[in-house]
A protein has these predicted regions:
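S-adenosylmethionine
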Residues: 1-437
Length: 437
């Protein structure tokens, strides 16, 4: 019997990659969709099933624990199928229950004869008995962990940083599907492009447009370089460098190159040197720069950002961007699997790397030059504590107070955007100026 590819069979294959083989959800999804013959609407359903199931994983596991006696006795793929089916029954009202059950039974039948009986029994029992009540969980952090599908340590951490009320708003925002967000490369065309794409102005970035849903990468405007996909919060980074056009700029952790290209767009006779550790990522930076028409101002270099001072001399750069490797806690809406692969210990080791990078690049900056330090995380260990530690160990630098018209994203002279404020990625931006040699 020939296996017919359906949206659910493809989504199951992606979810197996993510849950069993520890693949990144966005990479696994793109890989499977690329080779698929499915229609656009079905590909949309695959995306919904994958991101929805991954985002709600802890909640779904808790629900299933009331209907399955011993999950360890089940084949891994079968448990993943039940997770995906439970997601549809609980959260996708547009799909009739009987269709979810029938599709799951058919998938099980194709995979392993006899397994469809268990799938049918579990799903019908859920429909018969209803969903267990999460509010019955007595411990508050555990209850929030299950309700919002976040590990208990992260629930506790965000409450400690932001207080109960704001943390709760952050938790809720992380389960809302992220908007499609683009940067318009030529502001004189912004209005025209906004009309063409039926998009709205970004509340954060003057060059940004947003839309509830949209596949901008397939648009002609993307191919011709009139727009590029970049989150609103990330669009705030390059303008902080206050580029005049003739500077030598270093982008120390550049891949995939969105900020590199943004920096290059401000340059005329200047140049941005973009670093990464991997050749394939450097290729991405070049491709991006080429598409956006700024390749003549971008030079790539394979180099560990912690070794910049060994390769470049003093006074090599006027401006430096360190968009540092970080825990990515601000990206949980777009990359939900991040939350299951982290622990508190990561923050300390990441802080060490972040300070090492700053300590290296600062040696190549001319007097009067600036460093912008940014992350896509919202925990203080990687943000304010890094700023404090860097200034403490480098008296030749001072903090530059950043400004933005949205006052709710300003804190201690830095920009701190949490995901609930504008429905964007969580993000942090700070800046230092070299005042002496």
């Amino acid at each position: 019997m020939t296996k017919v590819e359906t949206a659910r069979s493809l989504a199951l294959a992606v979810l197996e990659d993510v849950f069993i083989n520890q693949a990144y959800s966005n990479i696994a999804l793109n890989k499977h969709l690329k080779g698929s013959q499915l229609l656009a609407a079905d590909k949309g359903l695959v995306t919904e099933l994958v991101y929805g199931t991954v985002a709600r994983k802890l909640t779904l596991e808790w629900y299933l624990s009331h209907f399955i006696e011993d999950r360890d006795k089940l084949d891994s793929w079968l448990y993943v199928l039940l997770l995906m089916s439970a997601y549809q029954l609980r959260y996708l009202n547009k799909i009739p229950d009987h269709a979810v059950v029938n599709e799951a039974v058919e998938l099980a039948k194709v995979r392993k004869k006899g397994s469809e009986k268990l799938v049918n029994a579990v799903l019908r029992r859920i429909l018969r008995e209803g969903w267990p009540d999460i509010t019955s969980i007595k411990r508050k952090n555990k209850r929030d962990s299950i309700a919002y599908s976040l590990p208990v340590w992260l629930v506790a951490k965000l409450k400690e940083e932001y207080g109960e009320e704001r943390a709760q708003a952050i938790f809720e925002s992380l389960l809302v599907r992220n908007k499609a967000s683009i940067r318009v490369t030529d502001l004189s065309r912004k209005e025209e492009i906004q009309t063409l794409l039926e998009a709205s102005d970004s509340s954060l970035s003057p060059s940004g447009l947003v839309k509830e849903q949209g596949h901008f990468a397939g648009h002609d405007l993307f191919a011709e370089g009139a727009i590029t996909i970049q989150d609103e919060s990330s669009q705030l980074v390059a303008p902080t460098l206050d580029l005049q056009g003739n500077e030598q700029v270093l982008d120390a952790c550049a891949a995939p190159g969105g900020k590199t290209a943004h920096i290059a767009s401000y340059l005329t006779t200047g140049q941005v040197t973009a670093l990464d550790l991997y050749d394939h990522k450097l290729d991405l930076i070049q491709e991006n720069a080429q598409r956006l028409g700024v390749a003549d101002r971008v030079q790539t270099q394979k180099l560990d950002a912690r070794k910049v001072h060994e390769f470049f001399g003093q006074d090599s750069f006027d401006k430096i961007l360190v968009d540092a490797p970080c825990s990515g806690i601000g990206l949980l809406r777009r990359k939900p699997d991040i939350k299951y692969n982290k622990e508190t210990a990561d923050f300390a080791s990441l802080q060490e790397i972040q300070l090492e990078i700053l300590g290296s690049v600062c040696q190549t900056l001319r007097k009067g030059g600036i460093i912008t330090y940014s992350t896509c995380t919202i925990v203080s260990e990687e943000n304010f504590q890094v700023v404090e530690a860097f200034l403490e160990s480098h008296p030749e630098f001072e903090q530059v107070e950043l400004e933005h018209e949205c006052k709710d994203i300003m804190k201690d002279g830095c920009i701190l955007i949490t995901p609930e404020l504008y429905g964007s990625d969580g993000f942090f931006i700070s800046q230092f100026r070299k005042i002496s040699d």
